[in-house]
Amino acid sequence: MEINEFQNLIRELYQSRDEKRGADKTFLWFLEEVGELTRAYRRGEKENVGQEMADVLAWLASIANLLKVDLESEIHKKYPPLCLLCSASPCCCPGD
């Protein structure tokens, strides 16, 4: 599934509910899911980590839909297929 396909799926399924909730409350739900992801990671719950990542992505798509942001387009603009620092692919920058 492409990023736009996922964002459209979330729009089709939840846009009406998201609009009623509004961007501010939807953003709070997103943060709640980030917290759940953090807890699952810290506890070493590998299965839950993947599920929580999916939840985080879904809530991010909901926020993007409410704010009329095309995630796939923004990702391509922000992250071209090479490192922004060394211009190589894969990155050959010195370690962190």
Spell out what each predicted region is.
Residues 1-53, 57-96:
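Flexible "arm" and connector segments at domain edges
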